[in-house]
């Protein structure tokens, strides 16, 4: 119960696509991004460095790269529009930035879903000192 309260408090200050990203992860992967991916490997969570440790961590690496390629916007605060058709997420709206970020978030959520079988608890709260390798390019 205490953990849920802490998560709720943390969400109070979060706006834009971070909340929407959490929603997409829940819809597509069926699990909470905060509870499963906010502190995993070298790339899931704030920042990112070194080499991705497994397929799940690679999802976050690719997501970071996708955000880095978004033009003229702040990926962590922009809101976006999407709809659901036959169980599929369709990114849309008039804001090109929002559409780019939606596509990044959607791809990451699909990647998380597809890699649930290889999720490894040893990478949860992975020490940053283990992420010192030279990173690969996006």
From Swiss-Prot:
Homodimer. It comes from the Eukaryota. Its EC number is 3.1.1.4. Keywords: Calcium, Disulfide bond, Hydrolase, Lipid degradation, Lipid metabolism, Metal-binding, Secreted, Signal, Toxin. GO terms for biological process: arachidonate secretion; lipid catabolic process; negative regulation of T cell proliferation; phospholipid metabolic process. Ca(2+) binds at residues 43, 45, 47, 64. This is Acidic phospholipase A2. PLA2 catalyzes the calcium-dependent hydrolysis of the 2-acyl groups in 3-sn-phosphoglycerides. Coiled coil: none annotated. Binds 1 Ca(2+) ion per subunit. It catalyses: a 1,2-diacyl-sn-glycero-3-phosphocholine + H2O = a 1-acyl-sn-glycero-3-phosphocholine + a fatty acid + H(+). The keyword Lyase does not apply.
